[in-house]
């Protein structure tokens, strides 16, 4: 394998897939079209229900059929999702587009990390994973920050224009994926090209058994998965509802890129800080991160404009610092043949929590007449998990 070319393709994919220019404005655009926060929450719940359904199957497909093929298929789904969203006439088609996007993200999650880790493993460079992972994260965040500037083009692009441009970026990311090389680090992976469809049921059954055995043998993996899922809830929902929250406070829609840009900068700084941190106890590290994330989420929900923006930055920076170490530790403790499957369990648990969380946060906001009310409640709950972790005597390293 040409590792230099492989990493170039991985970095290119991370950048263009991160240019999701709709992330900064989609809630505000849908609200401007007459959709309530509850309806937007329903669409988001559809996303997470589909994600929950296909997270583990997509990881299994990646382990059985190949990580590269799965990533390319996900890129195609992402392009179709953006095209459908561009011309969606009602909530049903909005939900259908969200379902396609969720299917694509299910294919990406776990698979991209597994391909990157095993590419380094094939070349005997697993010690470089933290650095490469940090580079990927920072490229994605840089792309997200650049993409957030698209909110300044609202009067020119309109609703459909945002999604058509996003489809072009996703197509470029899929093309970069197609140029990658499938990493081979085990005998099972080497036999992929020779296996027939008749072999797949038996291979699938073996993969399920081996994955369950791996989870039982490594309780630390389960703890890492749950901790990441809990922290990712405020990470996404603050970005989702801060848009409407700022509009309520008088912030112009054309300037919604500013908090998104600053949040992206905070994420990059968080990754850089995480790269330099070496926590002795992941339990204590989680506790501190949960307290900070909870506090930041509460600020987004209850503070005035500057406090709201600072809270969003705090949440994004802290969670990315934690996820960098969680991702490396999880990859270190799970086997290569089940890597994509087990990392997909990580995303599945997140989706399982997001299905009720998204509409509930929106419903609380509708009930109180303020988009931030639900975020304030969520922030308190997340902070309580950090307090509970600090209260336990057992340490997880």
Regions found by a protein language model. Give the residues of each.
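Juxtamembrane intracellular "pre-TM" segments in multi-pass secondary transporters
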Residues: 1-4, 181-225
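Loop-to-transmembrane helix entry/capping segments in MFS-fold secondary transporters
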Residues: 37-38, 123-136, 253, 334-346
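C-terminal transmembrane bundle of multi-pass solute transporters/carriers
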Residues: 44, 68, 240-397
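Conserved MFS/SLC helix-loop-helix module at the cytosolic interface between two early adjacent transmembrane helices
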Residues: 52-89
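C-terminal ends and interior cores of transmembrane alpha-helices
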Residues: 76-90, 291-304
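Cytoplasmic helix-loop-helix junction between adjacent transmembrane helices
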Residues: 99-141
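Helix-loop junctions on the cytosolic side of multi-pass membrane transporters
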Residues: 166-195, 390-397
């Amino acid at each position: 394998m040409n590792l230099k070319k492989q990493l170039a393709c991985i970095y290119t994919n991370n950048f263009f897939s991160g240019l999701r220019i709709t992330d900064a404005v989609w809630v505000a655009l849908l609200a401007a079209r007459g959709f309530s926060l509850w309806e937007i929450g329903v669409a988001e719940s559809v996303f997470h229900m589909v994600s929950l359904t296909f997270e583990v199957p997509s990881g299994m497909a990646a382990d059985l059929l190949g990580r590269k093929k799965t990533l390319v298929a996900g890129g195609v789904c992402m392009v179709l999702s953006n095209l459908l969203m561009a011309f969606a006439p009602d909530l049903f088609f909005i939900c259908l587009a969200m379902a396609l996007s969720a299917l694509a993200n299910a294919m990406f999650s776990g698979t991209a990390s597994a391909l990157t880790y095993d590419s380094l493993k094939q070349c005997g460079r697993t010690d470089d994973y933290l650095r490469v992972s940090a580079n990927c994260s920072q490229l994605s965040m840089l792309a997200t920050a650049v993409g957030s500037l698209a909110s300044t083009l609202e009067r020119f692009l309109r609703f459909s224009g945002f999604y058509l441009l996003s489809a072009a970026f996703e197509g470029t990311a899929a093309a970069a994926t197609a140029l990658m090389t499938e990493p081979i680090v085990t005998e099972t992976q080497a036999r992929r090209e020779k296996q027939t469809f008749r072999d797949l049921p038996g291979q699938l059954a073996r993969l399920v058994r081996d994955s369950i055995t791996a989870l039982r043998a490594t309780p630390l993996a389960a703890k890492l998965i749950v901790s990441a899922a809990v922290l990712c809830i405020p990470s996404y929902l603050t970005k989702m509802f801060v848009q409407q929250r700022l509009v309520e406070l008088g912030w112009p829609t054309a300037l919604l890129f500013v908090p998104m840009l600053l949040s992206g900068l905070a994420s990059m700084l968080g990754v850089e800080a995480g790269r330099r941190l070496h926590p002795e106890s992941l339990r204590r590290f989680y506790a501190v991160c949960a307290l900070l994330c909870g506090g930041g989420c509460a600020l987004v929900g209850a503070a005035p404009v500057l406090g709201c923006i600072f809270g969003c930055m705090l949440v994004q920076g802290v969670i990315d610092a934690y996820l960098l170490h969680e991702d490396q530790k999880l990859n270190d403790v799970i086997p290569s043949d089940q890597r994509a499957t087990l990392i997909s369990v990580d995303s599945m648990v997140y989706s399982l929590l997001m299905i009720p969380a998204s509409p509930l946060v929106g419903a609380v906001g509708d009930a109180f007449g303020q988009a931030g009310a639900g975020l304030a409640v969520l922030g308190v709950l997340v902070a309580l998990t950090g307090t509970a972790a600090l209260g336990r005597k057992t340490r997880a390293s």
